[in-house]
Structure formats: C-alpha cells, structure tokens
Amino acid sequence: MAENTNDSAVLETEEELTSYTTETNAGAGTGTSTIAPGYGTGRRKEAVARVRLVPGTGKWTINGRTLEEYFPAKLLQREVNSPIVLLKLEGKFDAIVLVDGGGTTGQAGAIRLGVARALNAIDRDANRAALKKAGFLTRDARVVERKKAGLHKARRAPQFSKR
C-alpha cells in the first residue's frame, strides 16, 4: 500500500515538470488588443524610424506620403504592415511615421520594428507574446562590414600570384 502512494506522488511530480514551460503562449490574447495611442522607435542598418500609432482607419503617413507612394514595392509594404496583420488589427490604427537614413529595405525594417514596439507599448499583455514569437521585437543587428586596408572590399583580397 505504501508503494501506491509513492508512485502517485512521483507521477504528480512528473506531470508538473512536463507541463512547465518557459515559453509564453503566443496565441493568448490575440485580437483582444486595446485601442489606444502608442509610440515606438525602430532601427535597421543606417535607418531610424519614429512611429506613432493612433486609433483610426488604417491610414499610413510616411514622411508626409502614403504607404503606396513611399514603398511602391508590395514586398516592402507587406513587411511594414506585418505586425498589424499578425495581431489582426488592420484598419484600427493610423500610422504616422518619420524615417530617415539608409535605403528602402533598411527603412522598411526600421518601420516594422517601430510599429511592433508601438503595438507592444499599447497593450503589453495581449500583444507581446505573439510579436516576440514572430521575431518582430528583435532588432536586426546586421550591418555592412567595414573595408579593411590592403583589401579591395571588406573581404575581397587582391589576386594572389604564387610566382
């Protein structure tokens, strides 16, 4: 009889250990976000974006121009809008963005990070898990490698001649 109580205690402990996880539930709270203003700053390569989200109809203003005018490429439009699409908040926020520095891809990445940080600031409990799991809250630290002396480019060396 003592063996049975010991076995049940071991089973309960195993269940507790297997059910424990350090990961947050990414599905928790999606779609239940609060509609309030938020602000976020994003950086990518040499680009810096300051993003303000205000409750609205889904209108984008980037340096005084619309999203389609500023980023004619659909790929970049999708990248910029991806945090809002992930949280199913299309048409609920107007975005006012000031971005400078870098090229188009760097600016799009900076805006995406700024939008994700603004959404995180608006409702941390509902939005953070999904944004974190998708990787939208992580700053992309890749930058161009500097040119070294004695080389043509960062790593391209002059042609080697044995004789």
UniProtKB/Swiss-Prot annotation:
Source superkingdom: Bacteria
Region annotated Disordered, chain positions: 1-41
A GO MF label: structural constituent of ribosome
Ranges of biased composition (kind: Low complexity): 18-38
Pfam name, any one: Ribosomal_S9
A single Gene Ontology CC term: cytoplasm
SUPFAM superfamilies: Ribosomal protein S5 domain 2-like (SSF54211)
InterPro entries for this protein: Ribosomal_Su5_D2-typ_SF, Ribosomal_uS9, Ribosomal_uS9_bac/plastid, Ribosomal_uS9_CS, Ribsml_uS5_D2-typ_fold_subgr
Keyword set, alphabetical order: Ribonucleoprotein, Ribosomal protein
One GO BP: translation
Family recorded in the similarity comment: Belongs to the universal ribosomal protein uS9 family.
Protein name: Small ribosomal subunit protein uS9
